[in-house]
Amino acid sequence: MTYNQPNNKGFYGQFGGQFVPETLMTAVKQLEEAYVDSKKDPLFQAELKELLKDYVGRENPLYYAKRLTEYAGGAKIYLKREDLNHTGAHKINNALGQVLLAKKMGKNKVIAETGAGQHGVASATAAALFGMECTIYMGEEDVKRQSLNVFRMELLGAKVHSVTDGSRVLKDAVNAALRAWVAQVEDTHYVMGSVLGPHPFPQIVRDYQAVIGQEARAQFLEKENKLPDALVACVGGGSNSMGLFYPFVNDESVAMYGVEAAGLGIDTPHHAATITKGRPGVLHGTLMDVLQDENGQMLEAFSISAGLDYPGIGPEHSYFNAVGRAKYVDITDEEALEGFKILSRTEGIIPALESSHAIAYAVKLAKELGADKSMIVCLSGRGDKDVVQVKERLEAEKEVKK
């Protein structure tokens, strides 16, 4: 059966929808209309395609990781190299599309939330390219963890607003950005960074990120003359994974694995394994799986990776899980650090801590699948932003061992 989600109300099965105050409903409807028009507009599509090619550097390679495959001792591992994009991650695919859409709608300001800083950098980059004003909302904790990315955003002309509410991380940045959008909706577009938020955001972000899977599918067919047996990608909000998964959704022979952050372990309070440990609830304008206590209070998400510590997951992922189209697994901080080191040493590629979760799971899965199988792993970003954090962590561990 051909997949055709979301429905016209923005639901993926029971998940999704538009749970926003009346003050935002007009903006959300306007965005929906503009987006539908842009899909039919050949000039818009041509401009986006040209930017992805000449500015982002697409298409990026599908790389056979021979030494990583040998290390894992099983299935062939191919890496979709989103780390090679301009700005160093998959986030630019979506940011460019949305800022171009904002321009089409006649808006001259953009705002965005960011966790690890990658989406903030991508949004600031796209805003600079189009000469737009840009404000980025970032939790105070993440501002500390990712000071280099904060400087990058400011260098690109963006104002970085440090959010001191709540636990001062990604979910608080989203809250602040949504509040700011309500106040200036006439001339401002909110560049949602993941497959989250009220409809049409999850669909827009999915469609702009689907270039990952479209390229990977064609590249794999060309190299192997068949489809892969499995796809593996890390999941926070879930945009790089949805970008990889969506073009394969009707290929039933292809298994999909979304890798959540298990932090210090899913049996501790310190993790971000939303599908494994969460249940449906409304957060940031959409119904999805969220981490909550028995009274429905939001729980804090925790991960070594600033890009994965979000207490929800895109509604389409919740739907994939509910219908069994994708399987959601988890990797701890320790395992992710090991993945970070393994890829660096076997392939000379330093991955982002987010992507390291996918690498760590891919090594496990390769052993299970066996040598006659193959997989594509989304290498969603490069690790430059994480090198200092990993260095400090490993040095601290050495001290403890002494």
From Swiss-Prot:
Cofactor: pyridoxal 5'-phosphate
Pfam short name (any one): PALP
Gene3D superfamilies: 3.40.50.1100
Pathway it works in: Amino-acid biosynthesis; L-tryptophan biosynthesis; L-tryptophan from chorismate: step 5/5
Residues annotated with N6-(pyridoxal phosphate)lysine modification: K91
Keyword presence, Repeat: no
GO cellular-component term (any): cytoplasm
Entry keywords, A to Z: Amino-acid biosynthesis, Aromatic amino acid biosynthesis, Lyase, Pyridoxal phosphate, Tryptophan biosynthesis
The UniProt record lists the keyword tRNA processing: no
Superkingdom to which the source organism belongs: Bacteria
Catalytic reactions on record: (1S,2R)-1-C-(indol-3-yl)glycerol 3-phosphate + L-serine = D-glyceraldehyde 3-phosphate + L-tryptophan + H2O
MF (Gene Ontology): tryptophan synthase activity
EC nos: 4.2.1.20
Summary of the function given for this chain in its UniProt record: The beta subunit is responsible for the synthesis of L-tryptophan from indole and L-serine.
Family: Belongs to the TrpB family.
Assembly, per entry: Tetramer of two alpha and two beta chains.
NCBIfam families noted in UniProt: trpB (TIGR00263)
Protein name as annotated: Tryptophan synthase beta chain
Organism listed in the record: Lactococcus lactis subsp. lactis (strain IL1403) (Streptococcus lactis)
